[in-house]
Amino acid sequence: IQIPTLCYDPYLSITGACRMCMVETDNNGLVTACSTPVTDGMNIQTHSEKVEERRKEILDLLVSDHDIECMTCEADGNCALQDLAYEYGLDESSYKKESASDRIFDFYKDNEFIELDPNKCILCGKCIRVDQEVQCSDAIDFIERGFQTKVGTTFDEGLDSERSTCVFCGQCVEMCPTGALTYIPSKNKGRSKDFRTEVTTCPYCGVGCQLELRIKDDEIVEVGSVYRDNTPNPAGEACVKGRFGLEFVSHPDRLKKPMIKKEGELKEVDWE
């Protein structure tokens, strides 16, 4: 049974923030499936008319607070919000943004790895939870209040500020369901539909983290997470080297064959 969700992940704590997993029960009416324990005798309807109407209304509200720039968005084709909008036939929100000009946030572009666009954020909190619960960096959290609430850093100073504890692991980008968080090095180099993927072991240290290489034209464009039990990084953990340090693979100076010095010069030889 497919139940839509935007804030749930099996490796994170449950918040029920997006409300998209709403289901109908006999005793309690509409409840969030992720945060409601199953009990004996419970009768649950996952796709009743009432449930579908409420989900579409919730999605309408989420879209009203999201900049729809799918044609130029890096997450186009790999966006959970976009997928649900397509599924529910929602091409634009029926709600008008109140004081929209007062809620245009500045981008975080203070580093060379991660871009944060709060204008696309739906406040699901997945990036915050993976940062605090899996990576344990406590680099980002909800800041401001009410209509001005957004995801940000300490004193809203940016990810690379002196007081920031961000280690640029990229976990927040991997968790983001909307394209509010994207990788800067791979910008304008391709989208998910353009990539072929290969799972490999990170070459940097002896931990053996599993990484997903996203490849286009035989070059590594970006490195994603692998969520697999019985691995050193089951929740997709990675360090800045593993996430952003594999450009050397395609570097023209990379040695691809063994070399031996003959007469004062290095010359390529066979592996045998």
Positions of predicted regions on the chain:
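N-terminal cofactor/phosphate-binding cores enriched in small/glycine residues
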Residues: 1-40, 50
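N-terminal export/assembly segments and adjacent metallocofactor-ligating motifs
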Residues: 24-27, 42-66, 72-272
